[in-house]
């Protein structure tokens, strides 16, 4: 047993021993080696007998350790700056741990009266936690990371910046030993992508669910009422698309999910009319919804017959009449709006027929669709304006339009005098309004013909020859 204790060995001269295989080198204390003593570094720094030595060799070791600590701090700062340069400006505003530059300046310097004593080495678990916090605070380039702002880990990170300048390491190999478990464990401590943030791509839309984004909280003004729906904004309306829709579903099923209020047969006809294109079918349905919405706004007014600027009662488009979606829709094609039903009794002449609603004295069952057109203003090839009937190319409305010649006029011979005698309407030549609503109280009358029987016998069935004979 020597004078320095059992762990210490003197470096003697070469001993004649057989050569051994080179073993893995274990770190030794540099101060003890300067004084001719070998001591293992593990658990030795606090109890080293030469820790306060001020000889030339020990001072050289102290200076070398300070240079290495400054290099480590500089490398950390450069690494953080390079990572911050990759982060876009929109993500820098998010709350997160303070940068390492502020962390070093935050702790108070120790008072000068107390001698600077070396701090004990930090456990590897704390180093790994601090490294994991640093990697979590910097978002990865491929995905967004959830921000962790735990106070205990932040304090450990603050202490890490402080120990980089104040802790004295007693060997050049000691720094490698301390940094090696930090790097080895930080590689295994990468925080995986937070399960709260999910990137859902449905039809080319990237959507972020709740959590991780402060704008998606319920108290945010931008938060929608339906968090699990995707809002598709089109030129004529907005529709909410559920996240549960998959790309491999048939287009008809997708339309049923988006428009649950429409009948499946109507959706199928619209889809066939669009050639199976789902986007075009959605646009058609959205445009029809916008026209119905405009009609619902008008239905809030008193249900009376409004006149256009030119004073003609039958020159309206469909949206100018006070009708609601329940009175005029694809599902109710055989229903007549209540505001356009006239009484069969022509003796009840209101003094101002345009001021009050034109309602019959008793309810009448609906029979035929209303044909809103002016026979003199529109040709036979285009009897409707483009926005009169949105879903005109469906087979149901086409068949009803082919049956328009079977309708009869609901007006008796003297009922049009109510409108012609009104001072609001200008005097016009008598024309066939082509509104056919048969009543229970009046008998069926034959269709009023424009030509007499003698003229009709002389003319052919061709519409071209009729036009020529009329012009002559």
Curated annotation (Swiss-Prot):
Gene3D superfamilies per record: DM DNA-binding domain
Q: Which UniProt keywords apply?
A: Developmental protein, Differentiation, DNA-binding, Metal-binding, Nucleus, Sexual differentiation, Transcription, Transcription regulation, Zinc
Claim: Phosphoprotein is one of the keywords in the record:
no
Return the annotated DNA-binding positions: 29-76
What would be one Gene Ontology cellular-component term for the protein? nucleus
The signal sequence is none
GO MF terms listed in the record are: DNA-binding transcription factor activity, RNA polymerase II-specific; metal ion binding; RNA polymerase II cis-regulatory region sequence-specific DNA binding; sequence-specific double-stranded DNA binding
Record note on quaternary structure: May homodimerize.
Tell me the domain comment: DMA domain interacts with ubiquitin.
Name of the protein in question: Doublesex- and mab-3-related transcription factor 3
Q: What is the organism field in this record?
A: Homo sapiens
> Which gene name belongs to this protein?
DMRT3
